[in-house]
Amino acid sequence: MINNLNLENIKVVIFDYDGTLAIHRDKDFVKHRNESVDKRLNYYANAYQKPSNFYIDIEPCDRSEVLYKLVQELRNKNIKMYCLSGMKFSFHFKAKQDFINTQYGDDIELISVGTQELKLDGIKIISELNKCSFDEILYIEDLEDTVKFLKSKGINVINVNEIKWGVC
């Protein structure tokens, strides 16, 4: 049971990808990915060509065990799940979807929103598609700036690091 999450009125849960569903072993992965133009282009080419092993061998990530347990609970409650990822390019879209499918299951739909700033628009669209209010959506994010921004816009958001698993 999740100690500090009230899922009673939640119809949709939306996850961030990097640092939330996918825990990068290299905490400076963005810096290392962009050290040179060649390295950056090679990164995206590898993700496109080898999506099934990209987040295993090239940019290793682990799943969040707390979120894995939460996903199981959400699935049992028939709560719809999405992942909004602020991708510069969509060349690594398949790699991200493959990681999600392998680590969490194939019922989390990945959506690219281009930038962190467009996440609010993504949430609004998901709200419309699912015919639910912001109060019925829970967004889970690791970046505190994004958490604060979304809260200021009326979004029900929690920092992934605040989720506690245990007996209620």
Give residue ranges: language-model regions.
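Alpha-helical substrate-recognition element adjacent to the catalytic core
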Residues: L7-F99
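Surface-exposed amphipathic alpha-helices with a cationic face
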Residues: V71-R75, S127, V147, K151
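Short, basic/aromatic recognition patches
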Residues: M1-I2
